Swiss-Prot record:
SUPFAM superfamilies: Ribosomal protein L22. GO terms for molecular function: rRNA binding; structural constituent of ribosome. Keywords: Ribonucleoprotein, Ribosomal protein, RNA-binding, rRNA-binding. Residues 125-153 are annotated as: Disordered. Part of the 50S ribosomal subunit. GO terms for biological process: translation. Belongs to the universal ribosomal protein uL22 family. Transmembrane segments: none annotated. The keyword Signal does not apply. This is Large ribosomal subunit protein uL22.
Length: 153
């Protein structure tokens, strides 16, 4: 963990697992437009995601690419992980502030212009963590899995 990371945020995003995260706040773009792009890269290898985002036509691809690159650099600097071994374990977009502006209209009326922003969060972890997590999910006892299926039938 670096000196500038908030321990509570790291605990919420990663727990005690190795990895790193990056957050871009107040990105001047609608959260729904950013979510379209972030859904493409969630679960991908980090290097492949950065390469793919360079060729995406959406405007949201550029800030998301920068956040992924920042998370990779954070993992290399603070955790000593290699960029080739990282994958995007979590990626989500939250709504930021909404600036309200006024557009004058006919007959003295006015309408609102909403200038939305977003907070982009990306968490990268080593690929071994993904394989360990898959084994933990599939390693459920057979008796417990069987009893759940009988309840539903």
């Amino acid at each position: 963990m670096s000196k500038t990371e908030r321990p509570s945020r790291r605990a919420a995003l990663l727990g005690d697992r190795p990895g790193s995260y990056a957050i871009a706040r107040h990105v001047r773009m609608s959260a729904s437009k950013c979510r379209r792009v972030i859904n493409l890269v969630r679960g991908m290898d980090a290097v492949d995601a950065v390469t793919m985002l360079k060729f995406q036509p959406q405007a949201a691809a550029e800030p998301i690419r920068k956040v992924i690159a920042s998370a990779m650099a954070n993992a290399e600097q603070t955790e000593g992980l290699r960029a080739d071994d990282l994958y995007i374990s979590q990626a989500f977009v939250d709504e930021g502030i909404t600036m309200r502006r006024i557009r004058p209209r006919a007959k003295g009326s006015a309408s609102r212009i909403l200038k939305r922003s977003a907070h982009i969060t990306v968490v990268v972890e080593p690929k071994e963590a993904r394989q360990a997590r898959k084994k933990a999910k599939s390693g459920r006892p057979a008796a417990a899995a069987k009893s759940e299926t009988e309840k539903g039938a």
